[in-house]
Regions:
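N-terminal helix-loop segment corresponding to the beta1-alpha1 unit
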Residues: 1-155
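Single conserved hydrophobic/aromatic residue that forms the stacking wall/gate
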Residues: 158-166
Length: 166
């Protein structure tokens, strides 16, 4: 589910594949999303939120990336969906979690890359931090989110936990 007007940022990220058809042509977007279906939905509106809740009625796992500030601004609480759908597992992908001392902090890919420990093994320790090209922090986040979505059903079965903060 993508937020209008532009949806996934990768749709407008190059390199672009020259095509005659009026189809997606971002190589990054195609690499990450081939075979997937998507819908544009503005869940910040009352009707959009109702549509999202309706979609979640048949879902096992809901993966979102709404940080604490976004939830506070939109009024989407932590129990918003799991209270209506008690079997739903929500994977919350945020830079620093939804609780704790850093939950309200913003982040950037270079910060996440540094915190992953990978920056410790590249570059010169006496120089500025180096960011390797590509979208590695985002991919690492995706891998962790995927792991959480595989582990969460087992946790839910044994502990009845509804939310995993990745």
């Amino acid at each position: 589910i993508e937020m209008p007007p532009n949806g996934d940022f990768a749709r407008s990220t190059g390199p672009f594949i020259p095509r005659k058809e009026d189809l997606e042509n971002s190589a990054l977007f195609l690499h990450n999303n081939t075979g997937k279906k998507s819908v544009l939905l503005d869940w910040s509106t009352v009707n959009g939120l109702k549509a999202l809740e309706s979609m979640l009625s048949g879902a096992d796992i809901f993966i979102e990336d709404w940080d604490y500030t976004y939830r506070e601004t939109t009024g989407i609480g932590r129990e918003q969906f799991t209270s209506c759908h008690p079997e739903l597992i929500e994977i919350c992908i945020t830079p620093f979690g939804l609780d704790g001392p850093y939950s309200r902090w913003k982040s950037a890919p270079i910060v996440q890359f540094a915190l992953s420990g990978i920056m410790n093994i590249i570059g010169d320790p006496k120089s500025d931090p180096l960011m390797i090209p590509g979208h590695h922090p985002e991919y690492l986040t995706g891998i962790n989110g995927c792991n959480a979505s595989v582990i969460a059903p087992v946790s839910y079965t044994h502990l009845r936990a509804h939310e995993t903060d990745s």
